[in-house]
Amino acid sequence: MDSSSSSSSAAARRRINAIHSHLVTSSRSSPLLRSNPTAGEFCLDNGYSVVLPEKLNTGSWNVYRSAKSPFKLVSRFPDHPDIATLHDNFEHAVHDFRDYKYLGTRVRVDGTVGDYKWMTYGEAGTARTALGSGLVHHGIPMGSSVGIYFINRPEWLIVDHACSSYSYVSVPLYDTLGPDAVKFIVNHATVQAIFCVAETLNSLLSCLSEMPSVRLVVVVGGLIESLPSLPSSSGVKVVSYSVLLNQGRSNPQRFFPPKPDDVATICYTSGTTGTPKGVVLTHANLIANVAGSSFSVKFFSSDVYISYLPLAHIYERANQILTVYFGVAVGFYQGDNMKLLDDLAALRPTVFSSVPRLYNRIYAGIINAVKTSGGLKERLFNAAYNAKKQALLNGKSASPIWDRLVFNKIKDRLGGRVRFMTSGASPLSPEVMEFLKVCFGGRVTEGYGMTETSCVISGMDEGDNLTGHVGSPNPACEVKLVDVPEMNYTSADQPHPRGEICVRGPIIFTGYYKDEIQTKEVIDEDGWLHTGDIGLWLPGGRLKIIDRKKNIFKLAQGEYIAPEKIENVYAKCKFVGQCFIYGDSFNSSLVAVVSVDPDVLKSWAASEGIKGGDLRELCNNPRVKAAVLSDMDTVGREAQLRGFEFAKAVTLVLEPFTLENGLLTPTFKIKRPQAKEYFAEAITNMYKELGASDPSANRGL
């Protein structure tokens, strides 16, 4: 045997040993870990993720894994490897936290609101058994799909636990869905039983005759005597939640525990384009994701969590799996976002998960209050903020006097006890994250994920004070960036490699339900999920999201546009509440539709001496439009937008983009085809104006 074959054999043995080895106790002990300059500089002392050695790579791009588990992707909780399914997870909680508070609500049976009343883990376990037994009693076969069509409340989680313990597949439906979307999902997933509330019952009944798979409708809450009775010829029974519980108690059934690879849920993506897709997630997928997240996200049985983000979304769903594992108490909001602050004051949570939209509102509200207070109060806030910010940057504790004088009043807005804040679903600006850390004093972390990865792909590590990134890979997956030459993103880019984020590991969904074609479009032959997001690696192995591939379009001269990136830049303008950027291959310029902040608009108009007229007239005022566009240009230059990325015309509207007017998904992302249609007249008029001012500006060459 020559030296080259001997060397090759030794390398092969090293690769096999590395791949099959368990979690190493110290990354320094492994000679296989190397700094790789082409993949972003890092060192082992403060590296949050590591690059696999070249010979371990799959394909041409560097593969990153969490430094917490570099050679073995996590698939189970390290402390409880016996937990393999959602049923196992809940059984663990019922056993270990039986008498601990679990589900709390302020809403009474008659609809009034009072103090939080609690159900223990043990009581929830009993209700779960009764509910699952009730479904079996009604002849719903094991493996059937069960729809959940109402907002967050204790019964939502009990239904979900019952599905897990009796091998049903839960199919969450956003309460904001209309009859057409409900009909599509119910028929597509062949839902046999569906849980709803009085508010969603009518929407359901209006299309029940067109949903032949449904055999049982269970109404949560409300009065039993008000339930409609359907003709026996319909083949559908309508019962109340309480009646189903009693039927289950009278006819108890043993558990039918699922296997790890059994389907746990089909989550229908909200869909910014076209028809919703059913994301199929197994018990193993969900347990792996949450187990990986538990390496850096630590809850305690003394924690209190408020649930108000939609449980139909994977972000809140994963949070609930994690709260069960740690035995956390979960209090629910009343169901009205306008009353959320009242619920926070009553519950006083220690853990708060939200989305940038709410954090931005908190930030803007406090900053505006500080500026309008003026004088001594404003100077005191600025002194306190700068002192505490500097202390945090230096890794030190700030003087408690600043909390007593300034920040405790701000903390009280969220109940006064929040120690841990998480943000997801869309990017949180570095300024807002810094603000939350300083003002609330606890840990603030941002994550990145998607339904197709069972939630978290990456998250910020504890002790990492750098903002503007989404942290290191979840220990349950590996990440690589793939070149996107048409957008000029490559792994050879300096100073940081850039490309489309691709993910692989036990967190990856099994596919889109009944849609093999679209499944193959996003998962390649090597098992890599192509996310459509563009990222780069920062020093330390931190991932930063910089662009979006899926929503890109071309302008007339061939420039590629990523509208979400531009919209996020313009969101920093003082006038802008929301922004929709539009362009196409027939025009050489971008145009913008801006939902204005009415308070800022009124204040600015008064300061500029623009008198008379209502807000709608202000939106149509050429002077106002010019001021807004000028402010957008200023922010765009600060963000170093390229020339063709600037909006050349703007339409101002008072109406916000909402779920109700069909312009937003339930996760507050713009539905682009719908927005294009909704603002079609405004878009046409803007291009006419641009064409009149410069006939060559909006025609292809």
UniProtKB/Swiss-Prot annotation:
Induction of synthesis: Up-regulated by ozone.
Binding-site residues, ATP: 266-277
UniProt keyword annotation of Membrane present: yes
Propeptide: 1-38
Topology class, membrane: Peripheral membrane protein
Major localisation: other
Function in brief: Activation of long-chain fatty acids for both synthesis of cellular lipids, and degradation via beta-oxidation. Preferentially uses palmitate, palmitoleate, oleate, linoleate and eicosenoate as substrates. Can use myristate and linolenate as substrates. May play a regulatory role both in fatty acid import into glyoxysomes and in fatty acid beta-oxidation. Functions redundantly with LACS7 in lipid mobilization for beta-oxidation during seed germination, which is essential for postgerminative growth and seedling establishment.
Enzyme class (EC, first level): ligase
Chain ranges for the short sequence motif Microbody targeting signal as given in the UniProt record: 15-23
An annotated GO BP: response to ozone
Catalytic reaction(s) noted: a long-chain fatty acid + ATP + CoA = a long-chain fatty acyl-CoA + AMP + diphosphate; tetradecanoate + ATP + CoA = tetradecanoyl-CoA + AMP + diphosphate; hexadecanoate + ATP + CoA = hexadecanoyl-CoA + AMP + diphosphate; (9Z)-octadecenoate + ATP + CoA = (9Z)-octadecenoyl-CoA + AMP + diphosphate
EC number: 6.2.1.3
GO-annotated cellular components: cytosol; glyoxysomal membrane; peroxisome
Alphabetic keyword roster: ATP-binding, Developmental protein, Fatty acid metabolism, Glyoxysome, Ligase, Lipid metabolism, Magnesium, Membrane, Nucleotide-binding, Peroxisome
Null allele phenotype: Seedlings of the lacs6 and lacs7 double mutant were arrested in postgerminative growth due to inability to mobilize fatty acids for beta-oxidation, a necessary process to pursue the development.
Tissue: Expressed in roots, stems, leaves flowers and germinating seedling. Preferentially expressed in seeds and senescent leaves.
Example of a GO MF term: ATP binding
Listed Gene3D superfamilies: N-terminal domain of ligase-like
Protein name per UniProt: Long chain acyl-CoA synthetase 6, peroxisomal
Homology family: Belongs to the ATP-dependent AMP-binding enzyme family.
Named cofactor requirement(s): Mg(2+)
Chain's gene name: LACS6
Compartment list: Peroxisome; Glyoxysome membrane
